[in-house]
Swiss-Prot record:
The lineage of its organism: Bacteria, Pseudomonadati, Pseudomonadota, Gammaproteobacteria, Enterobacterales. Belongs to the pseudouridine synthase RsuA family. Keywords: Isomerase, rRNA processing. This is Ribosomal large subunit pseudouridine synthase E. GO terms for biological process: pseudouridine synthesis; rRNA processing. InterPro entries: PsdUridine_s_RsuA/RluB/E/F_cat (IPR042092), PsdUridine_synth_cat_dom_sf (IPR020103), PsdUridine_synth_RsuA/RluA (IPR006145), PsdUridine_synth_RsuA/RluB/E/F (IPR000748), PsdUridine_synth_RsuA/RluB_CS (IPR018496), RsuA_PseudoU_synthase (IPR050343), TruA/RsuA/RluB/E/F_N (IPR020094). GO terms for molecular function: 23S rRNA pseudouridine(2457) synthase activity; RNA binding. It comes from Salmonella typhimurium (strain LT2 / SGSC1412 / ATCC 700720). SUPFAM superfamilies: Pseudouridine synthase. It is an enzyme of class 5 (isomerase). Responsible for synthesis of pseudouridine from uracil-2457 in 23S ribosomal RNA. It comes from the Bacteria. The keyword Isomerase applies. Pfam families: PseudoU_synth_2 (PF00849). It catalyses: uridine(2457) in 23S rRNA = pseudouridine(2457) in 23S rRNA.
Amino acid sequence: MRQLISSENTMQKTSFRNHYVKRFSSRQASKSRKENQPKRVVLFNKPYDVLPQFTDEAGRRTLKDFIPVQGVYAAGRLDRDSEGLLVLTNDGALQARLTQPGKRTGKIYYVQVEGIPDNAALQALRTGVTLNDGPTLPAGIEIVAEPDWLWPRTPPIRERKNIPTSWLKVTLYEGRNRQVRRMTAHVGHPTLRLIRYSMGDYTLNGLDNGQWREIAQEKDR
């Protein structure tokens, strides 16, 4: 009887070890396949009213309506009501470099706001304002002319005829949820239109609204 029990225990242990080895080998093989996949980087000029994801149960427009490339994901978000540059990649290291706060990667936005910010408002944005999730990092803020490369938005923004608008060039080194909009609202100038122009070295140059292109990724960039 003892010999029978011992044999059963040995078989169970052997079966468990074989099952563990198979699962471990499967995970290692999957990891190896991912590591051996070529790194891909896609730049996309996202139109207004497009979700920064590939699926949506509600049937709204998504990246799938524009980009046929599979296996890439957006580095950071760009709200449905914002426009401009999305960087999509399957490279986790690049995603981290573009989005993690500790990397301090610069992101440039062109922002149309209601009213004309005075020096006090501009200085507050430059040095940092305190939002409900804490103070913002110092940012680059300039009043600029409307960009000459800008495309018309569909539908156009809603302007109040008795209130002028102005354009800001905003450079951030962090990326919180709807941060630019919350910053400008904090100083009394709500955002009417927001276009992301660049993330690190990647820019909108040469991309029409709704257009995408895949670029070669430099090693150790």
